[in-house]
Amino acid sequence: MRRAKQLAADSCTRGVFVAATDTGVGKTLVASALVKCLTQRGIDVGVMKPIETGVSRSRKAQSDGVRLQNAAGHCDSMAEVCPYVFRLPVAPLSAARAEGKTIQMATIMRAFNHLHQKHAYMIAEGAGGVFTPINQSLDVLDLINQMKLQALVVGESGLGGINHALLTLDALRRRKIPIVALVLNQCRPAHTKTARLQEQSTVSLLRRLAGIPVVGPLPYNPNMKKNWNESVVRFAKTAPIKKLARLVLASGQGRFSQPG
């Protein structure tokens, strides 16, 4: 715990928001592995998934919020870790409307601020891409701004990944949100020569064009869902995640820095 106190006192960096170029590109994997890596370094990490959709009663134990909390290894209230949970697997605005609810930024920020005060470092995970609407007037970009966190962008390493990544980075920059890194994830196996060529092209061009560190690509793991916790532990020990941990801890000196 001594190291956690040093982080809060000596560094302006207090957290990162794991955003994505799209849904299903590996946000929860990257966030969970990063949480595990930081906690293994003795850093007290708080986690949050402000909004999660597609959580049926039978799937609660496998929800993103629970997986993040398991990676952190603490017992914060799930009502704070994930203030809004909806059944339908659709955008937050639609999922909330289907249940006759409205997502309130104030509710999310109360939970975030409480967790932020308890922990030396916060990792929050978004829902979908950065323009995903969370209510009638706000989107995920507004959420990142409210939390005053740096962004960590997760994207796909295959075909189409270049456009999605550059659009996302541009959107964040237009809102003056600091970006730590772009993490590329192999969402599908690259079995064919063409698929491997496409991935190599995507990664190479993004390293040239992104203007920020590009980490990965993280390899495709077909057994991830069956052995989630074990996979996260393994990923946390890999060179890309260790590099990511160094990047997030070394950054954060911009306008979103918060006192310890």
Annotated model-derived regions:
Residues 2, 170-260:
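C-terminal lobe/tail of nucleotide-utilizing enzymes
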Residues 1-11:
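Short, basic, low-complexity termini and linkers enriched in Ser/Thr/Gly/Pro
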Residues 91-134, 141:
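Phosphate-binding/switch loop-helix module in NTP-utilizing enzymes
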Residues 18-19:
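Hydrophobic anchor at the beta1->P-loop junction of P-loop NTPases
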Residues 25-26:
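Conserved glycine(s) of the Walker
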Residues 49, 152-155, 180-186:
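Short internal beta-strands
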Residues 15, 29-102, 106, 113-114:
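N-terminal phosphate/diphosphate-binding loop that engages ATP/GTP or pyrophosphate donors
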Residues 135-158:
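Inter-motif core of Ras-like GTPase G domains
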